[in-house]
Amino acid sequence: MTERSLNNLILASSSKRRIALLKQINIEPGLILPADIDEAPLKKELPKDYSIRMAKSKAEKIQSSNPNYFVLGVDTVVACGRRILLKAENVEQAEKCIRLLSGRRHRVYTSVCLLTPDQSKQHIRTVVTIVKFKRLSEQEIKYYLASEEWKNRAGGCNIQGLAGVFVLFLRGSYSSVIGLPLHETYCLLSNYFNFNLY
């Protein structure tokens, strides 16, 4: 298989966390283009299915206007049971999320979709990570909400910041919870691109 330059790769996201995670393994896409798509879940859609659909939709949206590129779409979903916790749009929604997760296990689904040029091939990987938060005090909830770290975060959670102290245990991929499963992403891209980890 011909190895290509990373200039032929588009990341369908403007997430600073995902860009930083890719740089961590020496991957710098040629282009970074956020995909504007409808992110509303379908009726009775399960969290894993939603994550896959979003990652695929982001990649397809960007590739529709850039057909000669490889496109990487990624989506992270926080779920409590079958309930999908979307990005909080205001402090009231953030409070509902953080109270729901307090003292409970939840799952974080991150799906990665790699489309080859003209969508000739489609590769999808989904990583599921189980996270349990401690039971939060009213003061902890108050301080976390005041920090505004919940903004633009799936489920209002930012375990790279203050919410990191809420985590009793994490079973799975830490990088996936942040926004990109590094192992799975590396395996997908190394089939097509020439880059060095060291």
From Swiss-Prot:
Highest taxon in the source lineage? Bacteria
| GO molecular-function terms, A-Z | dTTP diphosphatase activity; UTP diphosphatase activity
Q: Does the keyword Hydrolase apply?
A: yes
Instruction: State the active site.
Output: 75
Predominant cellular place of this UniProt entry's protein: cytoplasm
Its Gene Ontology cellular component terms are: cytoplasm
Reactions accelerated catalytically: dTTP + H2O = dTMP + diphosphate + H(+); UTP + H2O = UMP + diphosphate + H(+)
Q: Which cofactor does it need?
A: a divalent metal cation
The site feature described as Important for substrate specificity is recorded at: 17, 76, 160
Where is it localised?
Answer: Cytoplasm
Keywords linked to the UniProt accession: Cytoplasm, Hydrolase, Nucleotide metabolism
EC number(s) on record?
3.6.1.9
For this chain's UniProt record, which GO biological process terms are given?
A: nucleotide metabolic process
A Pfam family recorded for this sequence: Maf
Note the InterPro entries from the entry. Answer: ITPase-like_fam, Maf-like
Q: What does this protein do?
A: Nucleoside triphosphate pyrophosphatase that hydrolyzes dTTP and UTP. May have a dual role in cell division arrest and in preventing the incorporation of modified nucleotides into cellular nucleic acids.
The record's annotation in HAMAP family points to: Maf (MF_00528)
Q: Which family does it belong to?
A: Belongs to the Maf family. YhdE subfamily.
User: Which NCBIfam families does the record match to this protein?
Assistant: maf, PRK14366.1
Which PANTHER family is this protein grouped with?
BIFUNCTIONAL DTTP/UTP PYROPHOSPHATASE/METHYLTRANSFERASE PROTEIN-RELATED (PTHR43213), BIFUNCTIONAL DTTP_UTP PYROPHOSPHATASE_METHYLTRANSFERASE PROTEIN-RELATED (PTHR43213:SF5)
Stated name of the protein = dTTP/UTP pyrophosphatase
Traced from the root, the source organism's taxonomic lineage reads: Bacteria, Pseudomonadati, Pseudomonadota, Alphaproteobacteria, Rickettsiales
